[in-house]
């Protein structure tokens, strides 16, 4: 906030915006808005942040939108990459319920090959994100027990959502010495 440049305390924009949104939901100011349909259909491939925004905007323009998601839930990085202590997943679920009530259809566990898109749509939006992390070309990278941040974060978020993993699939750091490469937000999230 620019107020900090004038020796004043900066405003808490994020917190203020969140408080306004929460107040709007608690006071029932947020209502379902079903637009007049234009007769066209759109398939959105990927239900991460970009796919959800595209679906919402297209829906409000009158398109009948169907969202295809490879995983068991929508949200992408919001759901699987951000720890619960930073983003309560009920916020995502609340927004998804609103999108569904406004007419957006979600189809989960759908692996879509972009060379074989589902038939019957007038247009397509491909917003699959990037499931591939940037690999480190360092000695030992191929050893057992070396993981990318999103492997750990995604699994932890899924465990907190009630999913179970076999012992062989589980990324378990308990009782181990752990080295996190990178001190940014993602590295800190892994430590958290």
Specify the residue positions occupied by each region the protein language model found.
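Residues forming the flavin
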Residues: 17-192
């Amino acid at each position: 906030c620019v107020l900090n440049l004038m020796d004043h305390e900066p405003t808490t924009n994020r917190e203020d915006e969140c408080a306004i949104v929460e107040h709007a939901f608690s006071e029932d100011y947020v209502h379902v808005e079903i637009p007049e349909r234009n007769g066209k259909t759109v398939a959105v491939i990927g239900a991460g942040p970009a796919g959800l925004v595209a679906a919402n905007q297209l829906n409000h323009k009158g398109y009948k939108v169907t969202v295809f998601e490879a995983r068991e839930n929508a949200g992408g990085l919001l759901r699987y990459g951000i720890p619960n202590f930073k983003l309560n997943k009920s916020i995502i679920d609340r927004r998804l319920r609103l999108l569904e009530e406004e007419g957006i259809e979600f189809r989960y566990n759908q692996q879509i090959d972009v060379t074989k898109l589902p038939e019957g749509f007038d247009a397509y939006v491909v917003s699959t994100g990037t499931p591939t992390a940037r690999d480190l070309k360092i000695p030992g990278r191929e050893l057992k027990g070396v993981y990318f941040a999103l492997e750990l974060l995604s699994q932890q978020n899924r465990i907190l959502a009630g999913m179970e993993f076999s012992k062989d699939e589980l990324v378990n750091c308990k009782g181990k010495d752990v080295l996190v490469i990178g001190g940014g937000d993602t590295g800190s999230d892994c430590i958290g």
